[in-house]
Amino acid sequence: MTSRRSLPRLAAAVLGVSLTLSAVPAATADPRIPAAPTVSEQQVMPHLRALQRIADRNGGNRAHGTKGYAESVAYVKRALDRAGFRTRLVPFTHDGATGNNLIADWPGGDPDHVLMTGAHLDSVKEGPGINDNGSGSAAVLATALQVARTGLKPERHLRFAWWGAEEPGLIGSAEYVGKLSAADRRRIDVYLNFDQAGSRNTRQWLVIHDDEHGETEAQQAFEAWFAERSVPTFDIGVGGSDHESFGNAGIPSSGFSTGISDCIHEACDDLSNVDPKTERTSTEAIVGVLWKLAATTPRH
């Protein structure tokens, strides 16, 4: 979560009502959409432990331009390569240092209708960034690996991204979007962003509402997923994380956050700053909505 943001609505939402994280049966499934797999804590928390270890052996952080960030990218890329994704590193330079965005494409689906999902992988220099944003990165990685494990055959093309240099000001995602052709921008039906997916003080899931493009199908899908499980949500606008880069380019966006944690941008944003149940719920929500959107008829 970039330090540039001012999110009074987000902070206020964290003061909302309490919730119960136990699973609640979902509504009757659409027979056209394959059932989304369940996610266990054991399928997502090991990624956070790995990111913590990377920070521990690299001066306590995984910031842009550091060995800790490079090792974080290598860890995620290795897992995706083994799972059968087509991965590529997209380099950029900021503040005299080279960084990489990691892009992973799942074979198949309509290349003219891309469903893109992402999270920033860098931390600030002051800490390991395990909730901000190891939690979002781990949830997106676990989702991608579920796609591979189940052999999902989507109607839309699935693309995943892990962004660099979000903390200094959305640099990596802005560089990526800025270099897309007009045709490639039009091919992205929606971009889903996840920043802080495991906050311990979560009261509501904060669903991104793209005001410029109206209520997107993705926002509706997230709100429906949470409502079916009696999980409170709160709408927030586009801004403050990498979805802003896509919104500025006219690309619809959604996603969610679990709110600003008690420790952010400090050394205490370590593994103890993530609630495993919240992280699991977030990952299951991403999986559930991605499965639905991947199987639906593209809008344009």
Named regions from a protein language model:
Residues 30-67, 122, 192, 196-199, ...:
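N-terminal capping segment at the start of a domain
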Residues 49, 53-107:
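A non-catalytic alpha/beta surface segment that caps or lines the substrate-entry region
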Residues 117, 121-170, 286:
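Alpha-helical metal-binding/catalytic segments enriched in His/Glu/Asp
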Residues 163-261:
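Metal-dependent peptidase/peptidase-like ectodomains
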